[in-house]
Amino acid sequence: MIGLNHYLIVSGLLFCIGLAGMLKRKNILLLFFSTEIMLNAINIGFVAISRYTHNLDGQMFALFIIAIAASEVAIGLGLVILWFKKYKSLDIDSLNAMKG
């Protein structure tokens, strides 16, 4: 039987993979993907704890995080498209070229 520990281990591993992607990558699009992996890892943890404690609070938090992640993707990808059209690059290092 799959217990709570298994779900939390998978959640922790996914979070570490997302964190490593955030720290290692210099591409804005890959940073968004890493953020989504981290948010989904948190969702797995919330839903697993919610399931084993018979409390719906974790599932409500997961739905809230999904809604926030959807808005982040919509706004973030729009900004990434505009950034690519203007600078022809998605590297984080090109952010230093911003003036404002």
Curated annotation (Swiss-Prot):
It comes from Helicobacter pylori (strain B38). Gene3D superfamilies: 1.10.287.3510. Its main location: membrane. It is a multi-pass membrane protein. Pfam families: Oxidored_q2. It is found in: Cell inner membrane. Belongs to the complex I subunit 4L family. This is NADH-quinone oxidoreductase subunit K. NDH-1 is composed of 14 different subunits. Subunits NuoA, H, J, K, L, M, N constitute the membrane sector of the complex. GO terms for molecular function: NADH:ubiquinone reductase (non-electrogenic) activity; quinone binding. It is an enzyme of class 7 (translocase). PANTHER family: NADH DEHYDROGENASE SUBUNIT 4L-RELATED, NADH-UBIQUINONE OXIDOREDUCTASE SUBUNIT ND4L. HAMAP family: NDH1_NuoK (MF_01456).
